[in-house]
């Protein structure tokens, strides 16, 4: 078979018979059949043994190919940039997955730490106990369960995304291509990832709302943040469901064609911007502690991590507009950044609050109270998450991880969790061991109960009362626990010790004794020590709440030996691990602690100078011995220690009747120092042996009428000088008054 050469290759020089070939050259390759003869020149012929494919040269594209042959840059625009390829996407996904699992480990396993005199030390309590105080110092590290669930769902979501990414990347590798956009669309289009991502986003927004609630102390602000966050989170979840399951699931700003994807993107952007703005505002308001403090120098690193975590979602939202191709791996960074924004900021806020409490623990001001806040029942447990709990955290004494812990200091600590408090007085047998350990000390000392009838000045709580309560509590002892049961804190069951003694029965009502109320503490202390070994390493057991951290740091407590065999539950692995870590940390601190020189220092005793009272006493004693009593007066000895020469006075109960008495003031209570009984007995014996007798001075009676007769005072000379502070003091008697004679 012989073919015409002009029918095959003469396209550049068309013949006159083939006008269509000249005007419309075809570029479609065609097959040459076998057994054909091809003529390549005058003497070159060869026969095709098999079918051959002939690709003609296209006149329309030949010049373009030849022109671009020397310029390689013309072919670069046909590919995506490197930051939008699959390699950065895979690395970003791997890094974010590792960070997510690190957050989960930090929230669930890491033990609690405490700030003790500026040093952050390891504690025995885990993060499951929540942000409560500690006797060792100010606690840092409590985490709510919303953060734990959010971090766990983010880690699960990124794990699913990693598996799908490697599966799609393997398919593209087998085809010999790399398409990051197609990989991202196929991974995000999976049904499993859509469901877990909606759940994860919900818990992330809730955890961020909980963190914002802790930033602001006022109850009004907390309520506003809670309900505003509810509204925005609900709308975001609604539009995310519509975008993923009703529409095509588009999340690129430049590719929006419907309103629902744009609204879903808008609510995500609004939540991120609001959270970032309020965290930055809080950092500026707490700039004294937020960025640097001498007692906690590493807070600068926590501040940098917190600001980066809250700014990362905002930065990548902006990059979606300017660099759309960067969104292939920017979604993963935004995802884990939202989880870190809640966890790291919570740690930052705890450290700031710890520094504030450590600095203000020596102050005299109490807790900050705002107008409109009800402090009796508004506590962190009264939040919207309380309805989802099954463990009933109100039975405990501390704020657990399921609470809003912004106000977990004063109100929650002193709430009446037990069934029988000091004022109701229920049956002791109805109280269990758990309730016995949950009793809290009262917020302020309980006032004595006033007597009913008849009215007794010694039992009333008014300013006219003749008995004043003094509660003695040395600084070297811890705050005594409260006795549970039928016992009520009143005068009837307290041990009244009267220091002032009087022999005369007429002046019993005029004297003011000092009453010391001491409660029996042996039973409560024994019960606390009996259950201490089992409760020390159990992180799920509510423990006895001691005094606040601001008070307990100033109380001297005996060192309690720590035993490594304290856990009664052998399957409590977490408690054993935390106890072992705490024991090793204590041993390491004991080894590294510098030795303190305990040699006794030299003691120098400087005697006190002589007082002027000694000189005055000698002269007064000489004058007293020269005075003798009248024969018509009754000879008896009167020993009194308060209001000896003056009548009882009810107008001013806070001023001592004699200048020799000392006024002892304790929180508004005033009592007068008197001589003790042994000194009185000694003085009575001396007076009996002396030949000089003393006539008693009768106390005049007061009447409301000015015309009532007045009892004449008889001259009297005191023979028993009172003793104040160990020094005898003699009182100079007043001269006798003349009786008033009425005009006839």
From Swiss-Prot:
Keywords: Cell membrane, Membrane, Transmembrane, Transmembrane helix. It is a multi-pass membrane protein. One of its GO terms (cellular component) is plasma membrane. InterPro entries: PalH (IPR014844). Residues 387-396, 586-596, 633-649 have a biased composition (Basic and acidic residues). Its main location: membrane. It is found in: Cell membrane. Pfam families: PalH. Residues 696-715 have a biased composition (Low complexity). GO terms for biological process: cellular response to pH. The chain crosses the membrane at residues 89-109, 223-243, 260-280, 299-319. Residues 387-407, 441-460, 550-570, 584-664, 692-744 are annotated as: Disordered. Belongs to the palH/RIM21 family. Required for the proteolytic cleavage of the transcription factor pacC in response to alkaline ambient pH. Might be a pH sensor. PANTHER family: PH-RESPONSE REGULATOR PROTEIN PALH/RIM21, PH-RESPONSE REGULATOR PROTEIN PALH_RIM21. This is pH-response regulator protein palH/RIM21. It comes from Botryotinia fuckeliana (strain B05.10).
């Amino acid at each position: 078979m012989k073919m015409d050469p002009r029918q095959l290759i003469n396209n550049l020089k068309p013949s006159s018979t083939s006008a269509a070939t000249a005007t419309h050259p075809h570029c479609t390759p065609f097959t040459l059949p076998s057994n054909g003869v091809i003529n390549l020149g005058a003497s070159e012929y060869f026969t095709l043994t098999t079918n051959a494919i002939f690709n003609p040269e296209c006149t329309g594209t030949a010049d373009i190919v030849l022109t671009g042959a020397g310029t390689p840059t013309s072919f670069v625009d046909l590919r995506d940039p490197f930051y939008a390829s699959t390699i950065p996407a895979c690395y970003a996904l791997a890094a974010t997955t590792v960070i997510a699992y690190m957050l989960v480990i930090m929230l669930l396993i890491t033990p609690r730490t405490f700030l003790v005199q500026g040093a952050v030390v390891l504690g025995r309590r885990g993060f499951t106990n929540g942000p409560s105080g500690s006797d060792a110092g100010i606690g840092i590290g409590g985490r709510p369960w919303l953060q734990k669930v959010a971090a766990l769902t983010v880690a699960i979501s990124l794990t699913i995304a990693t598996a799908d990414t490697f599966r799609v990347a393997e398919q593209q590798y087998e085809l010999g291509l790399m398409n990051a956009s197609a990989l991202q669309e196929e991974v995000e289009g999976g049904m499993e990832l859509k469901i877990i991502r909606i759940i994860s986003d919900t818990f992330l927004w809730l955890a961020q709302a909980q963190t914002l609630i802790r930033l602001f102390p006022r109850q009004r602000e907390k309520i506003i943040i809670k309900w505003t966050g509810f509204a925005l989170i609900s709308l975001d979840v609604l539009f995310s469901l519509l975008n993923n399951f009703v529409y095509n699931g588009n999340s690129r700003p430049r590719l929006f064609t419907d309103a629902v994807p744009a609204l879903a993107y808008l609510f995500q952007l609004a939540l991120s911007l609001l959270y970032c703005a309020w965290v930055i505002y809080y950092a500026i308001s707490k700039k004294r502690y937020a960025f640097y403090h001498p007692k906690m120098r590493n807070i600068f690193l926590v501040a940098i991590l917190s600001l980066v975590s809250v700014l990362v979602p905002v930065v990548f939202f902006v990059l979606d507009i300017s660099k759309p191709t960067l969104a292939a791996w920017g979604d993963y960074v935004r995802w884990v950044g939202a989880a870190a924004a809640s966890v790291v900021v919570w740690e930052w806020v705890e450290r700031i609050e710890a520094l504030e409490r450590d600095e203000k623990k020596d102050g005299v001001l109490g807790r900050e109270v705002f107008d409109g806040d009800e402090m009796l029942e508004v506590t962190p447990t009264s939040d919207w998450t309380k309805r989802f709990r099954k463990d009933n955290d109100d039975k405990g004494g501390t704020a657990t991880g399921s609470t809003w812990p912004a106000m977990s200091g004063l109100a929650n600590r002193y709430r009446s969790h037990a069934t029988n408090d000091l004022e109701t007085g229920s049956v002791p047998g109805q109280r269990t061991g758990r309730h016995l350990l949950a009793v809290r000390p009262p917020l302020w000392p309980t006032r004595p109960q006033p007597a009913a009838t008849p009215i007794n000045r010694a039992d009333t709580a008014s300013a006219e009362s003749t008995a004043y309560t003094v509660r003695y509590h040395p600084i070297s002892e811890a705050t005594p626990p409260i006795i549970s049961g039928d016992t009520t804190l009143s005068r009837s069951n307290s041990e009244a010790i009267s220091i002032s003694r009087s022999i005369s029965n007429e002046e019993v009502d005029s004297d003011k004794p000092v009453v010391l109320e001491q409660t029996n503490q042996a039973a409560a202390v024994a019960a606390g020590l009996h259950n201490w070994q089992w409760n020390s390493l159990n992180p799920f057991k509510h423990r006895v709440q001691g005094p606040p951290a601001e008070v307990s740091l100033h109380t001297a407590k005996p060192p309690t030996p720590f035993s490594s065999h304290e856990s009664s539950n052998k399957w409590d692995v977490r408690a054993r691990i935390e106890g072992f870590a705490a024991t090793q940390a204590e041993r390491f601190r004991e080894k590294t602690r510098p030795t303190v020189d305990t040699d006794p220092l030299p003691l120098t005793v400087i005697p006190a100078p002589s007082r002027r009272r000694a000189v005055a006493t000698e002269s007064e004693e000489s004058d007293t011995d020269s005075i003798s009593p009248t024969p018509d007066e009754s000879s008896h000895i009167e020993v009194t220690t308060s209001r000896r020469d003056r009548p009882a006075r009810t107008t001013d109960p806070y001023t001592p009747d004699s200048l020799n008495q000392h006024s002892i003031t304790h929180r508004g209570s005033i009592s007068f120092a008197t001589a003790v009984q042994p000194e009185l007995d000694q003085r009575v014996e001396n007076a009996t042996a002396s030949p000089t007798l003393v006539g008693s001075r009768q106390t005049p009676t007061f009447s409301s009428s000015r015309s009532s007769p007045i009892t004449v005072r008889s001259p009297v000379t005191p023979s028993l000088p009172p003793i104040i502070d160990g020094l005898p003091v003699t009182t100079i008697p007043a001269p006798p008054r003349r009786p008033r004679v009425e005009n006839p």
